[in-house]
UniProtKB/Swiss-Prot annotation:
Gene3D superfamilies, sorted: MFS general substrate transporter like domains (1.20.1250.20)
Gene field: mdtG
Membrane topology, from the record: Multi-pass membrane protein
Function description: Confers resistance to fosfomycin and deoxycholate.
SUPFAM superfamilies hit by this protein: MFS general substrate transporter
Disulfide bonds: none
One Pfam family per UniProt: MFS_1
Location in or out of the cell: Cell inner membrane
Protein name, entry field: Multidrug resistance protein MdtG
UniProt family annotation: Belongs to the major facilitator superfamily. DHA1 family. MdtG (TC 2.A.1.2.20) subfamily.
UniProt keyword terms in alphabetical order: Antibiotic resistance, Cell inner membrane, Cell membrane, Membrane, Transmembrane, Transmembrane helix, Transport
Domain of life, source organism: Bacteria
One GO location term (cellular component): plasma membrane
Single GO molecular function: transmembrane transporter activity
Amino acid sequence: MSPCENDTPINWKRNLIVAWLGCFLTGAAFSLVMPFLPLYVEQLGVTGHSALNMWSGIVFSITFLFSAIASPFWGGLADRKGRKLMLLRSALGMGIVMVLMGLAQNIWQFLILRALLGLLGGFVPNANALIATQVPRNKSGWALGTLSTGGVSGALLGPMAGGLLADSYGLRPVFFITASVLILCFFVTLFCIREKFQPVSKKEMLHMREVVTSLKNPKLILSLFVTTLIIQVATGSIAPILTLYVRELAGNVSNVAFISGMIASVPGVAALLSAPRLGKLGDRIGPEKILITALIFSVLLLIPMSYVQTPLQLGILRFLLGAADGALLPAVQTLLVYNSSNQIAGRIFSYNQSFRDIGNVTGPLMGAAISANYGFRAVFLVTAGVVLFNAVYSWNSLRRRRIPQVSN
C-alpha cells in the first residue's frame, strides 16, 4: 500500500489530476523519440532510401500492432488485480524497454523492442478505466474529456522536446531521458493514485460470453469500438501526406518544415481547448448528441480541405477539425461507461484500445495508398466518406438503443 492510501474515501478529483499527469508524461515519452525515429533506424545500419522508408514504417507500426494484441489481456488482468497495478506495470515496463532501446545495436533488436513496447503499454486505457469507475456518472464526460487532454498535451510537447534533446545530446541519450520520464510516472502513480479494489480470483472472473451477456447492449458497444477505429483511421490517413500537401500548397518557401509542423499541431491545441468543455456539455445534453454532431462537423471540414489553396486555409480548417476531434473519443468513452459495469471496465476500455491501435496502423496505410493512386486531395474526400459512414452507423446504433427505453 502506498503512502497516499488509507481508509479515507477516495478523492476522485485528486486521482484525476494524478492520472492526467501520468497520461501527460507517457504521451510525452512516446512522442519524444518520434521526430528522429528514421534517423535512429539509419544509425542502426539501414541504408538506401526505400529500405529506410520501409524499416521506419515497420518499427513505427509494430508498436500499435502488438498493443492491439496485448490490450485485452491487460484489461482482463486489470479487472482481476486492479487498475492501479496495471498503471504501475505499464510505466515501469515501458521505462525499462526505453533504456534497452537506447542500447540497441542493430535494427532487429530495435524492432523486437518496439514490439515489446506495444506489449507492455496500456497506461492510457487503464487510466481511463480507473477514472471511469471512480467518477460520478453525471461527470463522466467532463472527467474523461479532461483526462484525454493529458495525453494530447504530452504528444504535442514531446516532439519539440525530443528534437531539441536529440540536437543537443544525440539520439541515444533521448531514450534514457524518456525512460527517466516513465520512471517518474511510475513513482507518481505509486505514491499518489488511490484505488480500493478487491482482487477477483480467476474462477470468479466473467468469461467472454458472460461479459457479452452482462452488457446492456452488446451491439452498441461493438459500434462504439468501430467508431473508435474509424476515428483513428481518419486521423492517421492524413498524417503521411500532410507535409507533402503543405509543400504543394506553399510553393517555393524555405520554412516548409516549420509550416507543416504548425499545421500538424493545431488540431491538438484545439482538442485541448474543446475536450473538457464539450465533455461537460455532453454530461448535460447526452454524449450521443455530442458524438453525432462532432462526426458530421468533421465531414463538413474534411471536404473543403481537399479544395484549399493556401496553407493558412488548411491550418484554419484543421484547427476547427481538432475542436471536433476533441469531443469524439471522450464521448465514445462516456457511452462505454454508461453501457457497461465497473466489473468489466478494464476489459471494455482495453478492447476499445485494441480497435484504436488497429486504426493507428491502417489509417496511414490507407492514406498512403490513396495518395499514391489518386493524389493528395483525394485522401480528404475518401476520409470524409469514411467519417460520414461512421456518423450514419453510429446514429443508427444509438437510435436503436433509445427505442427500447422509450417503449419501456
